[in-house]
Amino acid sequence: MAKGFYISKALGILAIVLGIAAVSTIIALSVVYAQEKNKNAESSPVSSPVSSPVSSPVSPTNPSTTAATTLAQSKPWNHYRLPKTLIPSSYNVTLRPYLTPNSNGLYTFKGSSTVRFTCKESTSMIIIHSKKLNYTNIQGQRVALRGVGGSQAPAIDRTELVEVTEYLVVHLREPLQVNSQYEMDSKFEGELADDLAGFYRSEYTENGVKKVLATTQMQAADARKSFPCFDEPAMKATFNITLIHPSNLVALSNMLPRGPSVPFTEEPNWNVTEFETTPIMSTYLLAYIVSEFKNVQENTPSNVLIRIWARPSAMDQGHGNYALRVTGPILDFFSRHYDTPYPLNKSDQIALPDFNAGAMENWGLVTYRESALLYDPQSSSIGNKERVVTVIAHELAHQWFGNLVTLEWWNDLWLNEGFASYVEYLGADYAEPTWNLKDLIVLNEVYRVMAVDALASSHPLSSPASEVNTPAQISEVFDSISYSKGASVLRMLSSFLTEDLFKKGVASYLHTFAYQNTIYLDLWNHLQWALGNQTAINLPYTVNAIMDRWILQMGFPVVTVDTTTGTLSQKHFLLDPQSNVTRPSKFNYLWIIPISSVKSGTQQAHYWMPDNAKVQNDLFKTTGDEWVLLNLNVTGYYLVNYDQNNWKKIHTQLQTDLSVIPVINRAQVIHDTFDLASAQIVPVTLALNSTLFLNQETEYMPWEAALSSLSYFKLMFDRSEVYGPMKNYLRKQVTPLFNHFEKITQNWTDHPQTLTEQYNEINAVSTACTYGVPKCKDLVSTLFAEWRKNPQNNPIYPNLRSTVYCNAIAQGGEEEWNFVWEQFRNTSLVNEADKLRSALACSTQVWILNRYLSYTLNPEFIRKQDVISTLSSIASNVIGQSLAWDFIQSNWKKLFEDYGTGSFSFSNLIQAVTRRFSTEFELQQLEQFKANNMDTGFGSGTRALEQALEKTKANIKWVKENKEAVLQWFRENSQ
């Protein structure tokens, strides 16, 4: 699933969703320009809440009642993990969604299911997942049971539904026989709710007419909301899906139909579509959709049918064409990368109007937010285009790694999502070879997640399976550690093995475990096998020994270099060095570290730092004017610190001839010094000194690292006297960059060609406007005024729209806000709507922001999938932050009920609204908020709340210790 997804990855609307660590370097400068570049973290993966069921759509006709919700651990149905007594082999599922409400105003679906399973251990009960389903009586019971292949089924004594653990329990009068097969039939009805989970409905307007479709989101634990099933990833089976649907609509599922749809004998206006049997697969990868969508399609040379589906108006305007163009090359790339053909005969990808994740890798039928699949050359920015190709690559990577070979349990989710988050850059780079996408993983994944992983409240990539049980616990695993740290350490592993060797090991892993389940050690073993079958690459330790230190303990090291002696030392890096690390590590927070380096521009031999606190090697010893720089291209997941003299020589090199240091490492110098200063390892003035060369810099990555790093200063000081001198300094530094792009674009009439140039143009304009460059304000006013004169013909180049919209709203009043609101309400282009919706949060008028906050409670105004993002946008505004905080406190119960348990984005809301907290009063407020809402709970935001408390304390301390030095530095350097 995409984050970003998931992550995501990734994928993007708001800078604020990246602001997840108190003294991080990844908070984007403003709500505008990061929209064009970063992955939409709030659209990362989710699963549905586990609260009590909604009102039943039908009255049950069952002989037994729902079980009490108190758990007695001696009873197997009170354990969240399924017993190993029964193993499914196949399902036959028929579903009929009703896309008009019933007499009670509810949308419902009816279904029937037959599951075949084998008894592996003698048992007198069947425990199967079921959630919010009402069963129709079959011979006096909720289900019927029969033997297969000559076995006799025991009689059913009673059945019960256990709400807390989401089980249907069938008590039998006699035990099932070991190695015998059985089939269980059921008929049921459920609500086709708009809750974005399980089998749900999505609504949209086409040509002024309301339309309803039925779709699915099963990951992680919501297939059970659609039909009774053994809903764990290791419980693989085949599935025969049949959909009964209105004859004017199209039915889709993981597989192609067996043949044409046929009329439903009971009602001629309905059709029946029966799909081919799936391969052996996990329940969370199932998908089925009923809609009036249209498609564009093509066949690959290997005869795989590719189809892109979306609303008819979007397809008629060609918005699916870019996705179709890149899907074939990406599938071809991964087939060769994995040395394994694409496992299915078709690849459907569909853009949904309502979808809580960024995308979901359902096998053969990938579902997306519209913004992650559709691209309009007339209104979409380069960031929108990058999002489409990277999210497609992420989801198609899963078709092998995740779908063909699947994790045993959710505690190893990091391997599934981290792998896809790494290779998405490789697949997208193949589809767009001129974009240099592989470099952007450093900014989008490595630096983003370091901000979280440097907290004492972080967690290891891999946890014991026993620590991940409930749906809420599973949901918490879908975080930036799993996605971005997973990607970062796998990239590091691929780098020191070499990509070719890494690919050989992965191919062997996929060939061995096709249609099976694995744990992360299985991958290590196959990489070790690949290593052992060649002699060119030698490691001083096994893959297992190296990598376990990176995945079984949280955090990462800072490597400190003393260039006078050549000594290297390592230490667990914490943004707050006084924070209390309560999680023990059997490796004592020491790592085996791959070290690459250059000395005065010349690359040196590779070096392995053992898991010792201190070592010495002359590679890192300098004399005279020599300087040394570690972690080339930031392939290693660690920070680097140097003695003061070496830092000074690096800064001198940057200010005299910056081209000697690679672009990525110019970004690294800025990023690392700011993180080190945050942790009080180096003076804050050293970090600020690393930005002095920027008046000569025109490359994207160093500027992005600087703006992200300085955005923390903005958060801490935009309510204090420091902000004035800070604005003056940044205005001085960015003016040459603004002038550079003004020149190369012929006064903004042309556009840069490369991806990173376009991103840096966005940086230049956004930063110049934020910090008061007069020509930028004039540019914004002129472009916005031209648009208002003719709203049907927007003259603003898509890359600059977020910046122009936001600044126009900030400079204007009610009239400007209402104009943008009307454009938002009327546009059918999702990427344009996202830009407008974010910009509406830029108002500087309190009453307008409060009105906008109230709109988030009305799904007619703001879609449910966009509520968290909208609240986060408002919170990113220095004026809106306190308003959003008050609103969230007042509406916590409703927000929690709607988003709290299953939404990855919910944690981002807590992070966004608290990221400016830097006073004792705000800390007290946060602690009181926690105390006041213990009964309601915090769901998937629980860990984020603890991190917010930790970050607030760190912010208070940092501001107290650094405010005067920062104020003095900006005053001295802003002239």
UniProtKB/Swiss-Prot annotation:
Pfam families: ERAP1_C (PF11838), Peptidase_M1 (PF01433), Peptidase_M1_N (PF17900)
Major subcellular site: membrane
Segments passing through the bilayer: 12-32
Example of a GO cellular component annotation carried by this entry: cytoplasm
Residues in compartment: Cytoplasmic: 1-11
GO molecular function: alanyl aminopeptidase activity; metalloaminopeptidase activity; peptide binding; virus receptor activity; zinc ion binding
Region (Disordered): 41-68
Residues that, per the record, bind substrate: 358-362
Binding site for Zn(2+): 394, 398, 417
Keyword Ligase applies: no
Residues of this chain annotated as glycosylated in UniProt: 134, 240, 271, 533, 580, 633, 689, 747, 826
Gene Ontology terms: biological process: angiogenesis; cell differentiation; peptide catabolic process; proteolysis
Matching InterPro entries: Aminopeptidase_N-like_N, Aminopeptidase_N-like_N_sf, ERAP1-like_C_dom, M1_APN-typ, Peptidase_M1, Peptidase_M1_aminopeptidases, Peptidase_M1_dom, Peptidase_M4/M1_CTD_sf
Catalytic residue list: 395
Disulfide bonds: 769-776, 806-842
Region (Cytosolic Ser/Thr-rich junction): 33-74
Biased composition regions of type Low complexity, renumbered to the chain: 43-59
Superkingdom of source: Eukaryota
Function: Broad specificity aminopeptidase which plays a role in the final digestion of peptides generated from hydrolysis of proteins by gastric and pancreatic proteases. Also involved in the processing of various peptides including peptide hormones, such as angiotensin III and IV, neuropeptides, and chemokines. May also be involved the cleavage of peptides bound to major histocompatibility complex class II molecules of antigen presenting cells. May have a role in angiogenesis and promote cholesterol crystallization. (Microbial infection) Probable receptor for canine coronavirus (CCoV).
Subunit architecture: (Microbial infection) Interacts with CCoV spike glycoprotein. Homodimer. Interacts with SLC6A19.
Domain remark text: Amino acids 1-191 are essential to mediate susceptibility to infection with CCV (in canine/human chimeric studies).
Name this protein carries in UniProt: Aminopeptidase N
Record organism: Canis lupus familiaris (Dog)
Origin organism lineage: Eukaryota, Metazoa, Chordata, Craniata, Vertebrata
Recorded name of the encoding gene: ANPEP
